[in-house]
């Protein structure tokens, strides 16, 4: 009798949740859409908002598309909530953002180029952002038409175009006037600091997970030497992107050319090698960064060659011999660094990166460390590729 009652209760609960869960999610979606309409109305948009949708799969900010109707035209905008838990000074960040985009736009106009850059849409009070009643910071940029992003390149030309676009981005910003940009995340690519944070996370074991990942901890400890291979203070300080994943470059849908670099929150003073290395990490790999089938994770030397070619074509004249001399090692360092960050976040209870499933950060760690091993096996070939493409450049 008791078992029958238990089964009946489970059935009732299942039916109840089956009925009400869709209603709950529908109510939450309607509440979110209402908020997005309200926030969007705080900006100087052309036309009135007729629809919105969630956009992208970023790990930090929340992003939405706004569709605005203005007489006979349809205008699209990108609305983002700046994660002020990650970016502690959103106003300073938006000052960086505005300065960088104005400078890039001026360069594009001066060169009469067909390239694009993000353009900030001011709030109704004239600022580059809106702060809502809950203390959240929001910004709007014009949607860039005609471009497409890729998590993994479909061919080596896409990797070449992305590398060329990032090199042009660095080169265009090399003469930006004014005070240095704000460090939106201090020590963002301080690999030594990332290692020490990882070691502390292992020792504290706040989430009780370290016993599950002993092999990964050992792997990271064995490669501590990588933490000191590229120190920012040993290289020229440049205005760099700091998050140069392949999908942060829009490639033209028709021509395939790199047309716009996006996701500018971490643009700040830094080392060009970190930008180069992070692009290689995402573009010269046969899989996405959270691939669960590790047999698919491998480094692609041929694609690396295309990246070196594109980057040297646009940024080679800017780089000095020390930077070029570390182009082979940079991808290993940045891959190790990101693996450390994912592992640290897992040990701390998944508090920084967005996770979409149990063990998501762990999947990311395993994929990055597998990629690192593949890079280590290809290091000599990478060095030969750099020598081949740098031979024609006059280095400072």
Q: Residue locations for each model-derived region?
A:
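Conserved ATP-binding subdomain of kinase catalytic cores across diverse folds
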Residues: 62, 67-69, 74-77, 82-193
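ATP/Mg2+ or Mg2+-diphosphate-binding catalytic cores
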Residues: 337-396
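ATP-dependent phospho-/nucleotidyl transfer catalytic cores
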Residues: 87-91, 147-160, 175-241, 246, ...
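Active-site activation/catalytic loop segments of kinase-like enzymes and analogous catalytic loops
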Residues: 273-317, 333-352
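Active-site acidic catalytic loop and adjacent metal/ATP-binding pocket
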Residues: 59-68, 74-79, 120, 224-274, ...
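Protein kinase glycine-rich loop
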Residues: 54-57
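Juxta-kinase regulatory segment immediately upstream of eukaryotic protein kinase catalytic domains
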Residues: 25-48
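Cationic, low-complexity basic patches in intrinsically disordered or flexible, solvent-exposed regions
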Residues: 11
